[in-house]
């Protein structure tokens, strides 16, 4: 009975389906909405990141908005047109593309064209900032926090979007620092007079100037000028002569360094470098005790805080002279000490530091490329008082007194043969030969520098 009933129901269902209209039997498929048009990506490696930044924020009007406008767009185009000097070699081409995109947006009044122009300007700016903040070559970074790093477009655009005035923000970022801006103006003038190509000297000085901050408190040592500058709030508040490395006889030019100083040492020991110990060894071997006593030297067991003092006769000085043995030699604090009364160390792999000196006659010389690489300062007390904000002369006579700073002070040792002065640009002899491309180990990396002249004045 149940089987018969099931058969009957199946037959009825089949009849009903067969009698239904064909269109009713077809299940209607939902009609897909046409895809929303996407804004074209700018021709930039940062194009995808830039578009994603805008999409996440529902396309903010960074460039066409109230904080941007004509002044910011004009500033951007000026920056891009001379960007090869800054290391962005396709800057003029990008400027032409951006200018065309802006023109299309203004004439068409098409929202998609406006968005495309926003992306084009944002990508161009992100590319430029990455170019000027590219990692520097031939710099010893004693403090990794000071190293140039390539910024992500998100950060670049967030700073631009947050700026009260976009035009002023662009000008500030592109300025980099007063040294860089002044040298760049020279490079632009050279390009205008030389078929679009500035001198190698200007381009290499620009590359070396890039590591210098635009603000803050820091020490700047310019080995080409043979002077130390005390910079505070972006202003040069004092300077003094220095003695720097000898590139000719000793072949020890002072390298380019970016580091941070955290303390000074009053009444320092001088630990004699190994190569000098080897050099002195033949003379010491003739009369070890008398030689060391006359120069206030002593031999120590190790570099620990409380090393054992060794007898001069315990060292095989002939073996030291031959290079088959070594020893640790240091000079006690006092009038003969090569470090003078104060030493200003900062981390770096070459062991370079600032220090006082008992040899004052060197500061009267025009050429002060005399040292083994370290930097002898003309007035240690003035430098110390500026660093610490107080007079630290009365520190006593105890040896090796470490005086900590409340806050570390960056130290930038560079080599600029051209710098701004009160009367224009001062130029210095290229004693190290680093104004020739590839003269430094590994070569300094700079832009092509070729620009289309007549593209506008350089923003400072």
Where do the model's predicted regions map?
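Bacterial N-terminal signal peptides that target proteins for export
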Residues: 1-9
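Hydrophobic h-region of N-terminal signal peptides that target proteins for export
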Residues: 11-20
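Well-ordered beta-sheet/strand-loop patches within structured domains
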Residues: 20, 25-27, 31-44, 55, ...
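Cationic-aromatic interfacial patches
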Residues: 25-146
